[in-house]
Every structure is written in structure tokens, then in C-alpha cells.
A protein has these predicted regions:
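Active-site-adjacent structural elements that line small-molecule/cofactor binding pockets in enzymes
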Residues: 1-331
């Protein structure tokens, strides 16, 4: 067993959900065959997370099931608890990994017409507290700054195993909050070199398990770096991610991209995403390079690497399959 595969691996559907549900079922089976332990579904405007995981879970009973992540602004804590508890009741012998986080204004306001809200740290602290109360099965009376609940009691009977709450976090205060109140923290869009700093912030709050999305693809980097530029550009223009990229050592790229974007020059903005940045975050190469890259995240402090295959190339499912195997050390 290789060093990387000695850690429990997860697979996220986030980067290829556009290929449809059948691609998820197929990839989940490949993950089972390669020894993966969990399967994760993100949620923006495509597949709904809980129903997708219920179906995947029924077909692939070996896998724990994770939401990675749900926007807290789009569900009440009670509704979120109901969805997670339903998954847990359907799959009582598995871990349900309830990943939540603050989404972007584009997703919340523009795409869904919901209120984005202010005071994200205080709001998330309250969300985590109320969500855990709602999952307890006890009667909940709660009066906070953002939520008031009277008489909620989860109507799903659960055994001793209950959903674990995983908080997606980028900035120091949110990372510390994850360590303090969540069961785990989910890192994303960061190079391996920035993991240790992130883990240090988490540990200032507590002992939460560190999950990390690792963006890798067994494919030729040269013709596909422009896809990486487009991917990273779409996050650089989001303030929270821009700040994190700056902390990770990409201040020049962030400044140039945002300046060009503000001027309406998308072509120049994309060109400002350097090869160095793409190669550090959306990692492409042969199987050995992908395997070593996953190991770098483990060495830096990620407890559970969650492989996000970058399905770039003429045979997208082939890239996904090769990436799943390479990350697991099946070289």
C-alpha cells in the first residue's frame, strides 16, 4: 500500500456532474474498486445533493456520503438537518458527511434570488449551533440573531450514528470556527504549500478532521492549461477566494486578473492566470505526478484527500478513471 492510499480517499462529483448522473454511478464504482471510502456531491444549479447521494448510496453501499458543499443561505438549518438525517436513516451503517459553507453572492443572489446576508462569521457560528441542535432529536427552542425556532423536533429516528458536520472554510476566522464547532473542515482551491497554514488556523480552534479537495487530472498539461485558467479565473473574481489566493502566494496574479476583469478585458484576465498558479492548484500530468501531488497534500496535513478529477481531454471518462486509479496508487 502506498503512503497516499493509506489515507482514506474520497471522490467528488463536483468537477464532472455535468456529464450526468450515470457518470457519477460509473465513477463511484471505479472509486469502490480503487479503495475509496467516500463520495461527495456539490450543489449550485445542477444536481440536488441529497437525492443524488441517496441514489449513489443505494447503488454503492461501500461509500460514505458527503455534501461538498451546501450553501447555508439556501436552506434553513432545520431543512438541512432533515436532508442529512434522511440520508443517515437510509444508510444507517455509513458516515454522512454534511458539508456546508457560505456561498458566493453570484450563486445566492443572482442565481437563486435569495438573501446573501451579512456578518458571515457570526451567522455561521449560529448556523452550526442550531444545526447540531436540530440533528439531536431533542425539542429545539432557539432565539438567535439570524434564526428563531420554536418547538422543532427532528421527525427522523436515528441510532447512535448521526451526520458529521463539515464546514468549508478559507479565511483564518472561519477555519478556527471549523476547528471549534464542526466535526471537520473542508479545504478547496489551495496549493499544497498553503495547507499547513490552513491547518494551523483550524488547530487554533480545535481538533476537526481536515478534508481537502485535491484538483488533479491524468492528462497532458500543455493543451489543457487554458481550461485551468478559466477555472481559476472564475474563483479569482470572488472576493473570499481572491483573498485566499493572495495568502497562498498569488498576489500578482490576483491583482492583474481583477484589474483586467474590471476593465472588461476577459482575454487579458485569463492570460494573467500564470502557469505557476494553474500547475499548483489544477494539477495535470501523468499518473505518477498525480499520485505524488495527492501525497503532497497528505504530507502537508490533509487527513482525508478528496480527489476532484479534472476531466480535460478528448476522453473525459477515461481521464476520470485514470485519475481515480492514480490517486489511489494504482499505477
Amino acid at each position: 500500500m502506498t503512503a497516499a492510499s493509506s489515507h482514506p480517499l474520497g471522490l467528488t462529483f463536483a468537477s464532472f456532474a455535468g456529464l450526468g448522473p450515470e457518470a457519477g454511478f460509473t465513477a463511484a464504482q471505479w472509486a469502490v474498486d480503487a479503495g475509496y471510502r467516500s463520495f461527495w456531491v456539490a450543489e449550485t444549479t445542477g444536481l440536488e445533493a441529497f437525492s443524488t447521494l441517496a441514489a449513489i448510496g443505494a447503488a454503492r453501499p461501500e461509500l460514505d456520503l458527503g455534501t461538498g458543499v451546501l450553501a447555508t443561505q439556501l436552506r434553513t438549518p432545520g431543512v438541512t438537518a432533515m436532508g442529512a438525517a434522511t440520508l443517515q436513516a437510509l444508510h444507517p451503517d455509513r458516515n454522512i458527511l454534511l458539508g456546508i459553507g457560505v456561498s458566493s453572492p453570484t450563486v445566492v443572489r443572482r442565481w437563486h434570488g435569495a438573501e446573501y446576508g451579512d456578518r458571515p462569521l457570526a451567522r455561521m457560528r449560529e448556523e452550526l449551533t442550531l444545526l447540531r441542535l436540530c440533528l439531536s432529536g431533542e425539542k429545539v427552542d432557539f432565539a438567535g440573531d439570524f434564526h428563531t425556532v420554536k418547538g422543532f423536533r427532528l421527525g427522523v429516528r436515528l441510532g447512535e450514528r448521526r451526520p458529521k458536520i463539515i464546514l468549508a472554510a478559507l479565511n483564518p476566522l472561519m477555519l478556527r470556527l471549523a476547528g471549534e464547532l464542526a466535526d471537520g473542515v473542508l479545504l478547496n482551491y489551495l496549493p499544497a504549500s498553503h495547507v499547513a497554514w490552513s491547518v494551523e488556523q483550524v488547530r487554533a480552534g480545535g481538533d476537526a478532521t481536515v478534508y481537502g479537495y485535491v484538483h488533479v487530472g491524468v492528462t497532458d498539461p500543455e493543451p489543457n492549461r487554458d481550461l485551468g485558467r478559466k477555472d481559476l479565473f472564475s474563483y479569482i473574481v470572488v472576493d473570499a477566494y481572491a483573498d485566499n489566493f493572495i495568502r497562498a502566494g498569488f498576489a500578482d496574479e490576483v491583482a492583474q486578473v481583477r484589474e483586467c476583469h474590471a476593465a472588461g478585458n476577459r482575454e487579458a484576465a485569463l492570460a494573467a492566470v500564470s502557469d505557476r498558479m494553474v500547475d499548483a492548484i489544477d494539477i495535470l500530468g501523468d499518473a505518477h505526478h498525480v499520485h505524488a501531488s495527492v501525497q503532497a497534500y497528505v504530507n502537508a496535513g490533509v487527513d482525508v484527500p478528496i480527489v476532484m478529477p479534472m476531466p480535460w481531454g478528448p476522453d473525459r471518462m477515461g481521464v476520470i478513471s485514470d485519475t481515480i486509479n492514480a490517486a489511489a496508487g494504482r499505477l
